[in-house]
Amino acid sequence: MAEENAKPRIGYIHLSGCTGDAMSLTENYDILAELLTNMVDIVYGQTLVDLWEMPEMDLALVEGSVCLQDEHSLHELKELREKAKLVCAFGSCAATGCFTRYSRGGQQAQPSHESFVPIADLIDVDLAIPGCPPSPEIIAKAVVALLNNDMEYLQPMLDLAGYTEACGCDLQTKVVNQGLCTGCGTCAMACQTRALDMTNGRPELNSDRCIKCGICYVQCPRSWWPEEQIKKELGL
């Protein structure tokens, strides 16, 4: 990914998000110490590095959806695509828009900002790590997989780069209604807002709690495993 014997250069770009993804990256140093200290160089980030001009980088982690009324964000997004070898939609706001997609404007302190979309609607995205926020463990594993060129581990994240809409309803329409649900409960355990409960071995959605992050669908093993792999794992 980078020149031989050189640390991969990583940049962090913050758009329309709550900074929760950055906190997951920087405030879990006990988990990420080896990664952040010895394995990569953080070369850009508004709150991480004292640097005004965006440099060339191997990987850009983008937090937050992009506001179509914010010219600075639109320019920054275009620039990072030109300067980064790989772009990662980091967190659900960047990957799927999360609840920011449903903004109608009028909010303080930027009432004119009313249209928010996932970054893949505007630029090519190489991989996505959803979550609100992503766990520090998955951050570390994803970056290490990139360093080791472990494409098998990264394949679901590569596939998710083109999946820009998400809702707990996806479990019903794409898993349960297709006869694929095994009742494992992984989706309910993954939901960070407790919008999902398991009832009679099937997920039941409380739409008032759902923030459209998509992590429940992503964590469901039936959402991305090919049929041949499912049969192999189950011995069928």
UniProtKB/Swiss-Prot annotation:
It catalyses: oxidized coenzyme F420-(gamma-L-Glu)(n) + H2 + H(+) = reduced coenzyme F420-(gamma-L-Glu)(n). The keyword Transferase does not apply. The keyword Transmembrane helix does not apply. PROSITE patterns: 4FE4S_FER_1, 4FE4S_FER_2. Its EC number is 1.12.98.1. Residues 172-200, 201-230 form the 4Fe-4S ferredoxin-type domain. Its cofactor is Ni(2+); iron-sulfur cluster; FAD. [4Fe-4S] cluster 1 binds at residues 181, 184, 187, 220. One of its GO terms (molecular function) is coenzyme F420 hydrogenase activity. Keywords: 4Fe-4S, Electron transport, Iron, Iron-sulfur, Metal-binding, Oxidoreductase, Repeat, Transport. [4Fe-4S] cluster 2 binds at residues 191, 210, 213, 216. Coiled coil: none annotated. Heterocomplex of the form (alpha(1)beta(1)gamma(1))(8). Belongs to the FrhG family. Reduces the physiological low-potential two-electron acceptor coenzyme F420, and the artificial one-electron acceptor methylviologen. This is Coenzyme F420 hydrogenase subunit gamma. It comes from Methanothermobacter thermautotrophicus (strain ATCC 29096 / DSM 1053 / JCM 10044 / NBRC 100330 / Delta H). The lineage of its organism: Archaea, Methanobacteriati, Methanobacteriota, Methanomada group, Methanobacteria.
